[in-house]
Structure formats: C-alpha cells, structure tokens
C-alpha cells in the first residue's frame, strides 16, 4: 500500500499533540492517537519510569527477551497493523521524556520476528524517539513464510518502512512537532534492512548504520547451507569436532597469522592478509595426535574457500581465518544451519527438502527466486547520496556467521558500479573493519562502540569518537565524517569491571599500524 493510504488508515490526528513537558506521565497515559481504522489498532499506551525492569510476557519465548531494563522515563506505544488479509505487523514506539528531536528506526536479526527491545531502550536513553517491529511474524522460525508472500513482504521490506512512517507520525502527534533528523540502527539482517531502505525508501532515514550487513541475502543463505555437506554430520568418519576447531585449528590460524600486524595479541587485524595453510596440521609418522587426517585437511580447505556456482561465478566469498571460535558453534556443528534449512524448506522449496542434499544448483534456484527482491545487492545508491544521506557500515573481522569479506566485497562493488574512487564513495558511505569482533558484538577485540543495546555498547559515551551512532549524528548534522571509531573491550565484557583494552578502528581501505602507535594509514 502507498504511504499516504497507510497514514489515512492509521488516522493520526496531529491536532491531538500533547503538551508533554508539563506532566509527562499524565500526558503519556492520556495519549490516544486515533487508530480506529480496521487495519491499525492501538494495543496499549503506558508510561514507563526510569529504572523499570520491563516485563515482556507476550514476547515469543524464542526471541529470548523476557524483560528489558529501561533507564529513562518514556511513553510506550504498541500498535498492531494489518498489512493484508493474511499478514500483520506489531510495532512499538518508545517516546522518551528527554527527546532530542531525533528519530531512530531499528532492525531485526536472522530470519526472526523479534523486536530488539535492547535497541529501543538504547535509543530512548540517548534521546531518540525510537521504533521497532516484529518484522511481520513472531519468533525465530521461518515457518510463517511458507506459501505466504505477504508475510515475506513484511519481512523483506514492508515492516520496517511502514513502522518508520507510522513511528514518525506518532512522534509528531505526541511531542507536537516533527522530528528534525531520522536515523537507523541495525546489524546482520538489520544491516541488510538498512541498505535496502537506502535503495527503496531513501527519504526514510537521514543516516543509516548497517552493521555486518546480510547483503546478497540469497547467496548468504546458500553459503551457510553449504557447510553441512562440507563438514558432514557429527557421526561421520572425518567429522572435525567443535573443540578441534576452537583449540587446534584456531591456535594454528593464530600461529600463522596473528603477528602479521606486528602484535602477538590473539587478534588478526586484517584477515585478508592471512593465507592459512591447513596442511601444517596434517598427521605424519612423527605426529599422530593433535593433527588432522588428509580428508580433514581438505574439509578445512573447503571451509576457507570461496563458493562458486555452476558457471564458475562467485556466489559468496570465503570465511575469514580467525572466525573459528564462533563459526564452530554456528556452522561447523555437524548439523544444518537452521536459518538456511528453514529458508529452503519454507521459502525456496517445501518442508520435505533435505539440507544434506544441498548443492550449488540450489544456490541458483534460491537466487533466481529472489522473493520480494530480498537479495539486496544494489549497483547504485545515488538517490540516497543526492538527498544527503550518510551510511556507516561495520563488520567484525572474527565474524563466524557472515564472513567479513562480503562487506569488503560490497564496498568494492559499490565503488565499481557507481564509478567512484574510495575517497568519493567515502563522502557518503564509510566502512569500518572491527578487528577481534565476532558477529555484531563480543570477541577478544575492542568491540564495544555504541552499536546497539547490549550492556557493553550501551555503556559507550555518546560522542563521535567512541560511539558509532553519535558519529553518524555528527556526520549528518554537522558534516563531521568519522575517520576512526574507538572501540572498548571491558574486563569479562562487563563495564562494571573496568576497561581491558581500547583500540581505534580505521575506515576501509585504511589500515591500523601498530608499529606507528596505532595510527591509521
């Protein structure tokens, strides 16, 4: 549906704007935007005071978000919007007392339909009116996609766009004035959502943070599906155990590549420089323990190789060395990766599809299908650039769910397709490689830099040097583009225990030089 029609259906009456500054709790409780139209329903409005540990009893258990601590006074508005006669979106708008005039949209993850309440709390704590949705379905399964293109449309693009449009109107109705600037924050699937928004709805956001973006989505699904046939099941003869990946293989990766950056710290600054040779672990007459059979060496080689299609074209780049600690638990378990399994069963084929039979022809079928144009591999972001939009993307260099090489590939693809040099592309699109970070967060490196609502990033001071969201605000509102992002590693990832390390992360294609006092060059 067209946006104008959605606004009519929502029935927001801007004349009902409240004087929220006088008595915020009462203003919130009295706030009742008109949602009487059949397909937009206000589920509730509630005042949530600072310090509340908000219980979320109706949140699907698979989302693993039973509660959320709220650190500022806010007004919580929940809406249920029918997007067709067989699909709907649940949306929440959090309106803080300390509103700065900024609006923030948030994304989702995996194939799920889970509101990221931690990101709503993070945005509200920093003065944003913030919106999030269930992306058109509840929980972490893809089952609701089966033979339902409307639910897929919500998942691929509609839920975020619709929630953003509605969220902005609710914001104006509540505060009595429109937002000044609009931002987006998402990682993984949420990163893909951000890039897609820049392409399809360039006016939705003035600035976008697209972390570890799941771009070239269909090929990503196939790449993840490929690992089960490569590794075999856990009871197969040459299966490499999770502990072997984490201990033996990861240790050898570090032996070969850790000091390429001149520092022996368990972190590979630039995995693209690591040409890992698994043959170093091959069993010999003199080495019969803590080694790999020839078949296992070949498995490791395949894991660290790009995926090519039937005609020899690249489907997806290789997994980067150094990712073993996370990837072993996600992709090398001897079981199908669930997101890929369910995507093929409920979107590409049918529930009887056997993930053990995956081959490169399935990758072609999936990409040819490209439901709701979910691929997200644009050749052109000029419409977003021309309206003054700014994009920051980042990717952990130890990501064990989406290889960081894909974001580097995407950056280079955009530069080539748009006929831009790196300096020209960097005028509106900047990419930061985060050494020592796993998928979106965690890892041995300095991985906390304000990228979302988990405790460590949420504790990051809101300034452009240390906080990526603040850096985006500075770029959009003051024209100050980020050259580096300073990340923090807390002791045991607990901010209350103090800082372990801090490190600057450079914008691509610039690298960090440890030998020059950690200067980007």
UniProtKB/Swiss-Prot annotation:
Chief location category: secreted
Signal peptide: 1-19
Gene, per the UniProt record: faeB-2
Residues linked to a glycan: 13, 53, 85, 98, 138, 235, 419
Any coiled-coil regions, as ranges: none
Highest taxon in the source lineage: Eukaryota
Role played: Involved in degradation of plant cell walls. Hydrolyzes the feruloyl-arabinose ester bond in arabinoxylans as well as the feruloyl-galactose and feruloyl-arabinose ester bonds in pectin.
Gene Ontology biological process terms in this record: xylan catabolic process
Residue ranges of the TM segments: none
Reaction it catalyzes: feruloyl-polysaccharide + H2O = ferulate + polysaccharide
Keywords, ordered alphabetically: Calcium, Carbohydrate metabolism, Disulfide bond, Glycoprotein, Hydrolase, Metal-binding, Polysaccharide degradation, Secreted, Serine esterase, Signal, Xylan degradation
EC code(s) of this entry: 3.1.1.73
Annotated S-S bridges: 28-75, 63-114, 187-440, 257-274, 283-291, 506-520
GO molecular function, one term: metal ion binding
Binding positions for Ca(2+) per the UniProt entry: 258, 261, 263, 265, 267
Active-site residues per Swiss-Prot or TrEMBL entry: 188 (acyl-ester intermediate), 399 (charge relay system), 439 (charge relay system)
Cited PANTHER family: FERULOYL ESTERASE B-RELATED
Full protein name: Probable feruloyl esterase B-2
Homology family: Belongs to the tannase family.
The keyword Disulfide bond is annotated on this UniProt entry: yes
